[in-house]
Amino acid sequence: MCLRELDLNGLRIKTPAIVASLGADAERVASRAESEGADIIEVRLDLLADPDVIRDIRSTVSLPLIATNRIASEGGSFRGSEERRISILRDASRFSDIIDIELMAPGRDMLLKNISCPALISYHDFSGVPDNLKSIIEDAMRAGADLVKIAVTPHSMQEALAILRILLDVDCPLCIIGMGAVGRHLRAVAPLYGSLLTYGYVTGPTAPGQMSVRELDTALRCLGAR
């Protein structure tokens, strides 16, 4: 499989790309992520004691940065007001290449109006796989997504297969992730079907079923996707 290049408003990324999702120890391990095979770094602002750390990370790594301040209802740790959460993301956009905002976030449209970098609009379901995934993807694109991220939790191989079929059927910049025990293999396999990104960890998982960056790099190389 040949790498494809994704162009997000001038930001060029070779795909499938491995995103290192970094939490509380982001500043300490950011430089290590690249050496282990990451192509992009996600800074989970909701897991940081001080979200301003992202500016220090920006000065120490050359990889593109995704800023995420995950809302509690979608698996995140941010506990403040939505206004404050959006304000943190807006400030972080000055040091980021991509901003992640949830499709269902009350402050989504306000944020999108106030950032100039590409927007990754995300949707998470930690309990299953909704029947209307295609509609959710379409809603995200209509909302202004430059890239759509869908993270769902299949409970059977049939559901996992249905997720892969969506990657073949939908024509938009899309990342699909399988969470949980049944969905774990999709983190390595979905890129073969067109998922542009896959997320891994450096020191510890930030989502159910997440593999390490090193494991993903090895798996994708074995499968001919890198």
UniProtKB/Swiss-Prot annotation:
Q: Which amino acid positions bind 3-dehydroquinate, per UniProt? A: S21, E42, V43, R44, R70, R187, T206, Q210
Alphabetized GO MF terms: 3-dehydroquinate dehydratase activity
Identify this protein by name: 3-dehydroquinate dehydratase
From what superkingdom does this record's organism come?
Archaea
GO terms classed as biological process: 3,4-dihydroxybenzoate biosynthetic process; amino acid biosynthetic process; aromatic amino acid family biosynthetic process; chorismate biosynthetic process
**Recorded family membership:** Belongs to the type-I 3-dehydroquinase family.
Q: Name the active site residues.
A: H124, K149
Q: Write down the InterPro entries for this protein, in alphabetical order.
A: Aldolase_TIM, DHquinase_I, Type-I_3-dehydroquinase
Which gene produces this protein? aroD
Q: What does this protein do?
A: Involved in the third step of the chorismate pathway, which leads to the biosynthesis of aromatic amino acids. Catalyzes the cis-dehydration of 3-dehydroquinate (DHQ) and introduces the first double bond of the aromatic ring to yield 3-dehydroshikimate.
Documented EC number(s):
4.2.1.10
Which controlled-vocabulary keywords does the entry list? Amino-acid biosynthesis, Aromatic amino acid biosynthesis, Lyase, Schiff base
Quote the pathway field: Metabolic intermediate biosynthesis; chorismate biosynthesis; chorismate from D-erythrose 4-phosphate and phosphoenolpyruvate: step 3/7
The protein's matches in Pfam families, at most eight in alphabetical order, are given as: DHquinase_I (PF01487)
How does the record describe its quaternary structure? Homodimer.
Catalyzed reactions per annotation: 3-dehydroquinate = 3-dehydroshikimate + H2O
